């Protein structure tokens, strides 16, 4: 899964800020690629208003 940090977490709860950090996102427009697991999907669901998500196949992965 390719996750892009699109909106600042300023003004949101500390739990949501911690979730952004735990996904490895630090700066706006930063992109991380993470495995498609239930844990990662749960974290994305908590901050879905702050990020965009793309499904990435094995051949597209870096």
UniProtKB/Swiss-Prot annotation:
The family database entries (Pfam families) matched by this protein are listed as:
Ribosomal_L30
**GO molecular function list:** structural constituent of ribosome
BP GO annotations: translation
Would you name any one GO CC term? cytosolic large ribosomal subunit
- Name the keywords, alphabetized: Ribonucleoprotein, Ribosomal protein
Query: Domain of life here?
Result: Bacteria
The record's family statement is: Belongs to the universal ribosomal protein uL30 family.
Subunit and partners: Part of the 50S ribosomal subunit.
What this protein is called in its record is Large ribosomal subunit protein uL30
Gene name of the encoded protein:
rpmD
């Amino acid at each position: 899964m390719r996750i892009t940090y699109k909106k600042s977490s300023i003004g949101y709860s500390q739990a949501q800020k911690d979730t952004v950090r735990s996904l490895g996102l630090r700066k706006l427009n930063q992109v991380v690629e993470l495995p498609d697991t239930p844990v990662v999907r749960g974290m994305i669901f908590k901050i879905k208003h702050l990020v965009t998500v793309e499904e990435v196949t094995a051949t597209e992965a870096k």
